[in-house]
Amino acid sequence: MKQRPRSKEKDFMIRFFPEGGQLVEGVPSVVAFEATSKEEGTVGISGTVYGPDDVELTQFTTLHDGMGCFTYTPTDKQAKAVVTYQDKKYSFQLPKALPHGYVLNVASKEKALVIKVLRNSTSLKDTLALFISHQGRPLMYQTIDFKDQTVYHLPLSTQGLPRGVIQL
């Protein structure tokens, strides 16, 4: 009789989720995270992000159900997050940043969404398209031309938007 393979799940881990899907060198990014324990599920933690030469970049803490976020500007060197959980220190590598690309950032302000598309100076000056949809139905289309700027701002009124998940 074959035995089942042992679970390779670690005792404690943190997963990182850069807003917009990726980190880009030199572009400030919001990074969400989830901390989980094999035995407890989601857990509350706090920690510190360190850059090259162990320089402290930012601190972070969970907000709810093991999840939280922090703002971080990546470089060409990979950063690490250090946390203490149950009196034991853990170190996790943040995702590697791309040398060029785009970052999408969305913030909710009074009756509006503030959408920012950011790029670093080495990224191509492409014209991009931003599609906004709800339940697979297009709501809006916006062409983005950076010209010589690295940030494109698009305020979007929430009045008239349907309830539920809006996809960008």
Where are these regions (language model features)?
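N-terminal, cleavable Sec-dependent signal peptides of secreted/periplasmic/extracellular proteins
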Residues: 1-167
